[in-house]
């Protein structure tokens, strides 16, 4: 198994455990990164773009790593399943990313509700990637 895919699975498992222990901010971080890592793995495994080539593409694209990965997957979804599903996917991952940024960087209390929302979004994204890209 790919190390990145394995990290993705570890992170979703960690998100669940962290919620049970009331470490809500950390759980959101893990929920998001489980999806980000699975998207990078999908680009490698399904689309055949190895990690080194991804790094080169990112550095020449003028985009940040997370922006590039999200845009790549959503653009490919547009081709495979249509604009509606692509937009829905992109909106969900961006919502999850926003939760992660607020949780990591803002001086706020992170609640059970926020962490559960992040986990639900992450599980949906992961299931979607696994189903549609056989990863």
Stretches with model-predicted labels:
Residues 1-135:
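Terminal alpha-helical segments
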């Amino acid at each position: 198994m790919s190390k990145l895919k394995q990290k993705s699975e570890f992170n979703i498992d960690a998100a669940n455990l962290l919620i049970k222990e009331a470490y809500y901010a950390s759980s959101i971080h893990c929920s998001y990164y489980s999806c980000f890592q699975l998207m990078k793995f999908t680009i490698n495994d399904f689309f055949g773009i190895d990690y080194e080539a991804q790094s080169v593409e990112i550095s020449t694209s003028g985009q940040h790593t997370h922006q590039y990965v999200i845009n790549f997957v959503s653009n490919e979804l547009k081709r495979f399943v249509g604009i509606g599903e692509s937009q829905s996917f992109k909106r969900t991952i961006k919502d999850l990313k926003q939760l992660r940024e607020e949780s990591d960087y803002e001086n706020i209390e992170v609640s059970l509700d926020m962490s559960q929302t992040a986990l639900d979004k992450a599980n949906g994204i992961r299931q979607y990637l696994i189903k549609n890209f056989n990863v």
